[in-house]
Amino acid sequence: MNRVLLVEDDPTIREMTRMTLERDGFVVETAGDGQSGLDAFDRGPPDIVLLDVMLPGMDGVSVCRRIRAKSVVPIVMLSARTDAIDVVLGLEAGADDYVTKPFEPPILSARLRAVLRRATRMAEGSRMRFGDLEIDPKGMVVAREGIVLSLTPTEYRLLLELAQNAGIVLSREQLLENVWGYVWSGDTRLVDMHVRRLRGKVGADAIETVRGAGYKLARPG
């Protein structure tokens, strides 16, 4: 069973979410503030972190940033509808996805499972080169100028999707469906924030923005 670290300061929401996830087959450890969440993470890294944006003391964005500095574990942010700016900051800090409160319990469990599937899915295919960038799908390794890059599972899946469709413009909606697994309407900010982070690692020129259409990776030369 997958282990979830739930960091949420509201006792009612924390307990309701814990019960929901456990009923759906997850093993859940909880924390009520940012530092307690980091301590719990260090005691035994979970399979996925469910992290509230607004926390007392150290906020969720700071917690996300600290976890991401040492781990590629999937992170999903919990946010109120009024926390749009904080959600963007969380995505920029390395979160893989977010869920808006209030949420339907089945939707939350489905989103966590989708993120976990993306994180564990093994790709097939031959090595690909794009200038100084090399992608090894079988080993799930990406290197730039011979140096292996540290990518989160979502960043890796996004790069691989672009690479496997090199030269083709993929819309944000296509990327949401193929990378995030959304068959319903999703927030295209997820795509934009992850492209921005990915460019910071693979090079600003590696991924081209096609205005009004989407993104593409140039065909290997």
Language-model features, listed with the residues they occupy:
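Residues within helix-turn-helix
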Residues: 106, 173, 189
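Protein kinase-like catalytic domain
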Residues: 68, 116, 163, 199-202
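Short glycine-rich hinge loops at helix-strand junctions in the catalytic core
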Residues: 25, 166, 203
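Conserved N-terminal glycine/acidic-rich loop preference
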Residues: 157-161, 185-193, 215-220
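N-terminal/domain-start alpha-helical segments
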Residues: 1-120
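DNA-recognition alpha helix
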Residues: 175-182
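DNA-binding patch around the recognition helix
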Residues: 122-125, 150, 193-195, 199-221
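Short, Lys/Arg-enriched segments at the junction into DNA-binding effector domains
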Residues: 2-3, 113-169, 173, 220
